[in-house]
Amino acid sequence: MAKNVVVLGTQWGDEGKGKVVDLLTDRAKYVVRYQGGHNAGHTLVIDGEKTVLHLIPSGILRDNVTCIIGNGVVLSPDALMKEMTMLEERGVPVRERLKISEACPLILPYHIALDVAREKARGAKAIGTTGRGIGPAYEDKVARRGLRVGDLFNAEDFAAKLKEVLDVHNFTLTQYYGEEAVDFEETLNGAMEVADILKAMVVDVTDELDKAHKAGLPIMFEGAQGTLLDIDHGTYPYVTSSNTTVGGVATGAGFGPLKLDYVLGIVKAYTTRVGSGPFPTELDCEVGQHLGVKGHEFGATTGRKRRTGWFDAVAMKRAVQINSITGFCLTKLDVLDGLESLQICVGYKDADGNVKDVPPMAADGYDKVTPVYEEMPGWTDNTFGVTEFEGLPQAAKNYIKRLEELTGVPVDIVSTGPDRNETIVLRSPYDA
């Protein structure tokens, strides 16, 4: 039986998942998105050509791969059409290879308006959302008033449901936030324009994946964002609105957890975060600037500058516990080139001097702890583009080994550059 692999982020997102999914899809037949929306930004570089995908699974650039958007994804019809057009203009066939669950909640203009209005009202306490309507769409889903892809296929019923939910949200927009109302006819017409296009791509995702599994076809599940942004396990409330952890596969794609064979955790050799929220190892100094500049740390979705800091082994151990991670892919090792010494956070010290090896459960708990560091020597040799482990400096090998010891998980893949070829594969998830 072929292997079913989950690829997910273990930090606050932006770990390099897109490249890794693209690298590994040479042996996958299906690639599935199971949570999030077009707030994701997965960057792929193939033969020097850069592609950024927000909604369509990264496997779309492989001719033999079928891509699926599962029910756990909140789907913006407008974003999907733009992404499809971008790919098709570059000669990538999309419509015949992309399948969508009719249970996907829709992101419509009023979700975006609510998202922007809320962040504006929060002022200095803004969460740092992408402003793309992700959170409000998930809220409607949980409140059982959300419109889904399947609703588009009956225009009369869709219009009635839209009017009801839009009345609620327009009241909030105008009376509470003092913003303009979202136009009903414009929203309805925009949705109906894409109904037939979406209908042609709809499948029963659970049944499709079950048949693929029984046929022995390898399936890859592509996570978005990262473990520390999980709605339940992240630095709440500075989190996203979906389950970014491995449990999201079962709920967001209808694929039973016992069918999963390997969980690949993508982790940077340092740490970054976009937007507000706790960040114990953040560096507001020359080293932090080095990481940001050399690592090109700007969000693929928002363009915002990412905050940078040292590797946090405490947070990483929690990611291992939650996700049952089989192996790591360590990315951006080359960004550490040239640093004389490196720091690894191995504990959090509280106000009484007690050192803990588990993170707080909520954001305000981080105000009461400080990181405890272990120092390791850096290296001056260039690791960019190295494709053999023996080609790495000894100090880099030692760093990798120490991360393995601290987390209890092997590093199976090392990424040394953005291109799919700039990679050291010590053990493929398909051969583990």
Swiss-Prot record:
Its EC number is 6.3.4.4. GO terms for molecular function: adenylosuccinate synthase activity; GTP binding; magnesium ion binding. Pathway: Purine metabolism; AMP biosynthesis via de novo pathway; AMP from IMP: step 1/2. GTP binds at residues 13-19, 41-43, 306, 332-334, 415-417. It catalyses: IMP + L-aspartate + GTP = N(6)-(1,2-dicarboxyethyl)-AMP + GDP + phosphate + 2 H(+). Homodimer. It comes from the Bacteria. Keywords: Cytoplasm, GTP-binding, Ligase, Magnesium, Metal-binding, Nucleotide-binding, Purine biosynthesis. One of its GO terms (biological process) is 'de novo' AMP biosynthetic process. Its cofactor is Mg(2+). It is found in: Cytoplasm. Its main location: cytoplasm. IMP binds at D14, E15, G16, K17, N39, A40, G41, H42, T130, R144, Q225, T240, R304. Plays an important role in the de novo pathway of purine nucleotide biosynthesis. Catalyzes the first committed step in the biosynthesis of AMP from IMP. The lineage of its organism: Bacteria, Pseudomonadati, Pseudomonadota, Gammaproteobacteria, Alteromonadales. Substrate binds at A300, T301, T302, G303, R304, K305, R306. Pfam families: Adenylsucc_synt. Mg(2+) binds at D14, G41. Binds 1 Mg(2+) ion per subunit. GO terms for cellular component: cytoplasm. The active site is at D14, H42. This is Adenylosuccinate synthetase. Signal peptide: none annotated.
